[in-house]
Amino acid sequence: MAKYQTIEAAVRSEFGKGSARRARVAGQIPAVVYGADVESNLHVTVDHRTFAALVRQEGVNAVLELDIEGQKHLTMIKHIDQNVLTFNIDHLDLLAIKRGEKVEVDVPVIVEGEPAPGTMWVQDADTIKVEADVLSIPEEFKVSIEGLEFGAQVTAADIELDGDTTLVEDPETLIVNIVYPEVEAEETEDDEAASEGEEAAE
């Protein structure tokens, strides 16, 4: 993630639910910028369509340069408040950062491959927390479970990290567990119960 986009933002002069609602109706997202590089929180609005496209392309850990009426701030997404009904973005928290700074982020874990025949995989954790340079935040980590047998587990410690990225997550955090399908387990229990019933009848 060495490159980042520049998005224009406008300073908010009005506050409150009514003001935020009017901004959203006008196609804008209310946002707050905070961090060591800003003396006080900056309240701004950004274009909804432009920002939504950025998230689709770069992910929820995206780094972006915010152009606030000519003043530029390097920021990263810290929190997205999304409407549960419309899925539109209602509000943003953006952290002001510096080049060369390291930050802690939750990075998605993608499972690839198929385990041994007769087994299935269960993903216990969808993300892991790592520390990375703000301009080199991994978009995702891939974990291969190809051919893994029943009982095999993948933990946070097993994930290969890129470059200077370091693991913050507990190394023993379970990511993927290889198990037998629950249906087979239920059928086995039913068979045992039926067998016991037949023996009792005899």
UniProtKB/Swiss-Prot annotation:
One of its GO terms (biological process) is translation. It holds the Pfam family Ribosomal_TL5_C. Residues 182-202 are annotated as: Disordered. Residues 183-202 have a biased composition (Acidic residues). Part of the 50S ribosomal subunit; part of the 5S rRNA/L5/L18/L25 subcomplex. Contacts the 5S rRNA. Binds to the 5S rRNA independently of L5 and L18. Keywords: Ribonucleoprotein, Ribosomal protein, RNA-binding, rRNA-binding. This is one of the proteins that binds to the 5S RNA in the ribosome where it forms part of the central protuberance. One of its GO terms (cellular component) is cytosolic large ribosomal subunit. InterPro entries: Rbsml_bL25/Gln-tRNA_synth_N, Ribosomal_bL25/Gln-tRNA_synth, Ribosomal_bL25_b-dom, Ribosomal_bL25_C, Ribosomal_bL25_long, Ribosomal_L25_dom, Ribosomal_uL5_bac-type. This is Large ribosomal subunit protein bL25. Belongs to the bacterial ribosomal protein bL25 family. CTC subfamily. Signal peptide: none annotated. Coiled coil: none annotated. One of its GO terms (molecular function) is structural constituent of ribosome.
